[in-house]
């Protein structure tokens, strides 16, 4: 469960940073 969660975080984190900083 934890590796899956880490994988999800690794997938969504760049998108979140992109939306916050508007640097895509």
From Swiss-Prot:
Signal sequence: where? Answer: none
List the lineage, top down: Eukaryota, Metazoa, Chordata, Craniata, Vertebrata
Q: Per its database record, what is this protein's job? A: Has a non-hemolytic activity. Has a broad spectrum of activity against both Gram-positive and Gram-negative bacteria, fungi and protozoa.
GO CC terms = extracellular region
What interactions and quaternary structure are annotated? Answer: Monomer.
Key word Transmembrane present: no
Tissues expressing this chain: Expressed by the skin glands.
Organism equals Glandirana rugosa (Japanese wrinkled frog)
Predominant localisation class = secreted
Q: Give the protein name, as stated in the record.
A: Gaegurin-6
UniProt lists the family membership as follows: Belongs to the frog skin active peptide (FSAP) family. Brevinin subfamily.
Q: Which UniProt keywords apply?
A: Amphibian defense peptide, Antibiotic, Antimicrobial, Disulfide bond, Secreted
């Amino acid at each position: 469960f934890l590796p899956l969660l880490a994988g999800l975080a690794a997938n969504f984190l760049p998108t979140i940073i992109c939306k916050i900083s508007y640097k895509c």
